[in-house]
Amino acid sequence: IFLIGLTLFIFNLDKIINFKFLILIISIIFIGFIVSKTHDDFAFYHLQQSINFSKSKIQFGLSNLDFSYAKHSSLLYLNSNFYLPYFKYYFFNAPNQFFLTAIIITLSIFVYDKKNEKFLRYFALFSLSYILLKFTRSSEYGTDIIGQLLIILFIYLTILFFLTNNVLLKKEILVISGL
């Protein structure tokens, strides 16, 4: 999958409009990988489940041992895809970094978009400042915070849905919110 994405990126390199912005995003994500680490209690709760998911072992009755094996975040399935044999579990925080960077960039685009109404721009600015002040380090939040950040983005899109009169934009918002 990575090689397919890299090939498509190289072939479509001439179609990228803002190449400097793309380099900035890639640099931020790369620095985030180097600096970030997992949450302090990651080894106690989420590591075992992510390793079990990545090794694809079917084990019955684990919920009888501990309640955390019965109820888990769906993001742990995503974390388990980043188990690489050489690096082992050191890339389990990659989805956290991807989501955090994407949400920060999306909210900053919403803040600077002059076509948005003032209320939406203030909401995006307030949400962006909250995220940047609350999560100054990547290790300060666990795997469940990503869902809450996505809810902030969903609330923004819901408000935009009710404030806009553009039918095409409403359809796009419904598709994005459904994903």
Predicted features and spans:
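Active-site lumenal/periplasmic loops and adjacent helix-entry segments of GT-C-fold
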Residues: 30-121, 138-140
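Multi-pass, polyprenyl lipid-linked donor-dependent membrane glycosyltransferases
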Residues: 98, 124, 133-158
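Membrane-helix interface and helix-disruption motif detector
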Residues: 1, 16, 87-91, 137-146
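Membrane-interfacial loop-to-transmembrane alpha-helix junctions, especially the N-terminal start
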Residues: 18-22, 115-125, 169-175
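Membrane-interface alpha helices of multi-pass inner-membrane proteins
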Residues: 135, 172-179
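Membrane-interface transmembrane helices that cradle and orient dolichyl/undecaprenyl
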Residues: 113-117, 154-172
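Membrane-embedded, hydrophobic transmembrane alpha-helices
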Residues: 1-15
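Transmembrane signal-anchor helices characteristic of membrane glycosylation enzymes that use polyprenol
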Residues: 5, 18-41, 130-132
